[in-house]
Amino acid sequence: MRLLHVGLSVGSGVAVVTATGEVDMTTVGLLAERLDRAHGLVPVPRAVVADLSGVRFLAAAGVAALLAAHRTCGERGVPLWVVAPNRAVRHPLEVCGLMSVLHVVAEAATADTLAEP
């Protein structure tokens, strides 16, 4: 059984990475790879959205992957929005002091609206 499923889609120039399950040191590679691939799906994405609504556990490795994606997006001038409606994702980000560093929203619709031109 897979502990993490990660999908990747594009709509209106926004690359969306959707994760469901547990992000830990054994599964983080899949999330990191999809976040990195998100930039190549469209010539210049308006935004990359990491939808972690279905994530039940976010370990330090997952936080590090989000920071790396944030840095990569910043270098390319593309905002990264993190959808984190649940405590399993928000709490690690809060403890690490990243709520003001990352663009964290409670629902995907908010990220989609903010990514509009």
Show the residue positions of the predicted features.
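STAS-like cytosolic regulatory interaction modules
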Residues: 1-57, 68-117
